[in-house]
Amino acid sequence: MKSVLKVSLAALTLAFAVSSHAADKKLVVATDTAFVPFEFKQGDKYVGFDVDLWAAIAKELKLDYELKPMDFSGIIPALQTKNVDLALAGITITDERKKAIDFSDGYYKSGLLVMVKANNNDVKSVKDLDGKVVAVKSGTGSVDYAKANIKTKDLRQFPNIDNAYMELGTNRADAVLHDTPNILYFIKTAGNGQFKAVGDSLEAQQYGIAFPKGSDELRDKVNGALKTLRENGTYNEIYKKWFGTEPK
């Protein structure tokens, strides 16, 4: 009887230890640190809207984590193989992506925008991109949109949006198609008056925090924290810090 009791106690102790370890696990959070103003490197620190939002969520849930920067095109495969626990990188929620990964509730309403050189008077909207060279970031919604809606002369894909902007700046592309907030931020902060946005924002969709399939418990906790941050004003503070206005 004592032997059975000892075994039972040992098993119970091990179970608690495993449970405690899972609870204390440092989460690995994938991010693409070349997507201003959502996530980018400033000095030796990662900053941005997504970075601040996740820090607030982690504080609310008392989660320990580390950021793992990677190219955007590698994020979904990393989630599928569970090499990371979640990802924030301006990831648009789409039905196609939902087949491969899970998403939190939407946390930012975005869209796509066309950017051209400031002296370009030929391209006034996305309708004028047929027969043009268009630069995009690989693995993003801009690629899908361009393939489905634009008869480009050449659709040039780059792993980093900075390379796409450079392609336009050096006149090797006629336009860039990318996420609205990133284009507007680039024009305002680094464009030096050389670029302009044309036309309306396209394909309004939500960004979501991405998880591997089967992460229901963590996802539900994150959704709860997001709701709390919206209700207590923290979300609005972070939004205003990075976009200069209250969310609509």
Swiss-Prot record:
What is one term from the GO cellular component aspect held by the record? outer membrane-bounded periplasmic space
Summarize the record's induction comment.
By lack of glutamine.
Q: What GO molecular function annotations does the UniProt record carry, in alphabetical order?
A: amino acid binding; glutamine binding; ligand-gated monoatomic ion channel activity
According to the UniProt entry, where is the signal peptide?
A: 1-22
GO biological-process terms attached to the record? glutamine transport; L-glutamine import across plasma membrane
Q: Is Signal given among the entry's keywords?
A: yes
Family matches, as Pfam families: SBP_bac_3 (PF00497)
Q: Which UniProt keywords apply?
A: Amino-acid transport, Periplasm, Signal, Transport
Superkingdom as given in the UniProt entry: Bacteria
Compartment(s) where it occurs, according to its Swiss-Prot or TrEMBL record:
Periplasm
Q: Has UniProt tagged this entry with the keyword Signal?
A: yes
Xref: NCBIfam families: PRK09495.1
Q: Into which family does the record put it?
A: Belongs to the bacterial solute-binding protein 3 family.
Q: What role does it play?
A: Involved in a glutamine-transport system GlnHPQ.
Q: What is this protein called in UniProt?
A: Glutamine-binding periplasmic protein
- Give the encoding gene's name: glnH
